[in-house]
Amino acid sequence: MAGGEAGVTLGQPHLSRQDLATLDVTKLTPLSREIISRQATINIGTIGHVAHGKSTVVKAISGVHTVRFKNELERNITIKLGYANAKIYKLDDSSCPRPECYRSCGSSTPDEFPSDIPGTKGNFRLVRHVSFVDCPGHDILMATMLNGAAVMDAALLLIAGNESCPQPQTSEHLAAIEIMKLKHILILQNKIDLVKESQAKEQYEQILAFVQGTVAEGAPIIPISAQLKYNIEVVCEYIVKKIPVPLRDFTSEPRLIVIRSFDVNKPGCEVDDLKGGVAGGSILKGVLKVGQEIEVRPGIVSKDGEGKLMCKPIFSKIVSLFAEHNDLQYAAPGGLIGVGTKIDPTLCRADRMVGQVLGAVGALPEIFTELEISYFLLRRLLGVRTEGDKKAAKVQKLSKNEVLMVNIGSLSTGGRVSAVKADLGKIVLTNPVCTEVGEKIALSRRVEKHWRLIGWGQIRRGVTIKPTIDDE
């Protein structure tokens, strides 16, 4: 590989090569070796109550610590969505018993490596590449959790073995998974090293009772200790056997939901060395390629002289693609992908682009300023501890002119209810959003100073605005 041809991955020779010249998207699958060698194709959320060990489990499986920000480390909680990728391997020697034949490693590990288990031979071969979306467990951070749920294919529900089940956020998260129609759930009974066997069995019964009648009914319950890495290979085995590989669309025009964005330039950087903004997100469909022209909607939002909203989509070009530390020439749905662009870095600074949609020019959905939704409210507030035998507070009906928080894809924005009739509602959004009819949205209301999930809806139609495009 001398001289480096365009369109071929140069870095990481131990991973499968990606070559744009020979790329045929119709032949790709979520298990194609050249894809899973470099990026994850399944998104798994970790959900559960605060301090039940979600981030620790992700660290045990992937080796990546998802708590990255200073204020998160000090308080030992996850605030922003954390991400980590892990490769799961299976030993090709059939004499090795389960679950020892499964193993997880970080995302830049080679695609196969020889067995180090005494008495076995053969190689560990890559079978899955998963991305963990580590969601915050605090009720105040519920919006972040819902933004994560938009990109999940499956979920690990964590329950700490040394506390009674269910804890408040556990039920709220379970409701969020129901909204997002996540069918594949593994329940992990964590911190098993801290309790006696009888206690663990008793809690097992509590968990069974708690999930009865929910989407998690019948989900496997695996006792683990994330801190001691006990039973982690069983979790790997279940991820491979119980979570089906989602069907992906590789042939449509690509579309990515932006979940975070950054300016990667250091202060004092020379002008010639400035790099464009980086958007991180999950591709919903299609394949993004290096060198491709892209559009970001709604783009730059402003008001004209008469106070009318204007949206100016951002047009740019992809200069690099990466998944954690792996370079990509093309990126497929699943996993968190970093997209290096030529966009002005100040527009991407500190997550400013979150909630925008990035994709092929001219192929993105409409920009809505008002939505008409058919909605469904929860009967009672979730996750609020109540005194004694009193049931949780009832959810009041939507009232005209009240302000709700609306979650659409990865965007959280305010919305004023302008009309309500039976199960239909009209909402005027504070920020315009790029979305389509049929998308699901989550509704939260401010209750005692916290945003609480009160229900969800589906977009039936809405008021759209035409994007303003400069005639250059």
UniProtKB/Swiss-Prot annotation:
tr-type G domain residues: 39-247
Modification Phosphoserine, positions: S16
Enzyme class: hydrolase
GO CC terms, sorted: eukaryotic translation initiation factor 2 complex
Region described as G5: spans on this chain: 225-227
InterPro entries assigned: EFTu-like_2 (IPR004161), eIF2G (IPR050543), eIF2g_C (IPR015256), eIF2g_dom_2 (IPR044127), eIF2g_GTP-bd (IPR044128), P-loop_NTPase (IPR027417), T_Tr_GTP-bd_dom (IPR000795), Transl_B-barrel_sf (IPR009000)
Region: G2, residue numbers: 76-80
Chain positions with N-acetylalanine modification: A2
Enzyme Commission designation: 3.6.5.3
Swiss-Prot/TrEMBL catalytic activity: GTP + H2O = GDP + phosphate + H(+)
Chain residue ranges for the region called G3: 134-137
Region annotated G1, chain positions: 48-55
Keywords recorded for this protein, A-Z: Acetylation, GTP-binding, Hydrolase, Initiation factor, Nucleotide-binding, Phosphoprotein, Protein biosynthesis
Region (G4): 190-193
Entry binding sites for GTP: A51, H52, G53, K54, S55, T56, N190, K191, I192, D193, S225, A226, Q227
GO biological process, one term: spermatogenesis
UniProt tissue specificity: Widely expressed. In the adult brain, high levels in hippocampus, habenula, hypothalamic nuclei and cerebellum. Also expressed in embryonic brain.
MF terms in GO: GTP binding; GTPase activity; translation initiation factor activity; tRNA binding
Pfam families assigned: eIF2_C, GTP_EFTU, GTP_EFTU_D2
Subunit organization: eIF2 is a heterotrimer composed of an alpha (EIF2S1), a beta (EIF2S2) and a gamma (Eif2s3x and Eif2s3y) chain. eIF2 is member of the 43S pre-initiation complex (43S PIC).
Job of this protein: Member of the eIF2 complex that functions in the early steps of protein synthesis by forming a ternary complex with GTP and initiator tRNA. This complex binds to a 40S ribosomal subunit, followed by mRNA binding to form the 43S pre-initiation complex (43S PIC). Junction of the 60S ribosomal subunit to form the 80S initiation complex is preceded by hydrolysis of the GTP bound to eIF2 and release of an eIF2-GDP binary complex. In order for eIF2 to recycle and catalyze another round of initiation, the GDP bound to eIF2 must exchange with GTP by way of a reaction catalyzed by eIF-2B.
Remarks, miscellaneous: Has a homolog on chromosome X (Eif2s3x).
Name of the molecule in the record: Eukaryotic translation initiation factor 2 subunit 3, Y-linked
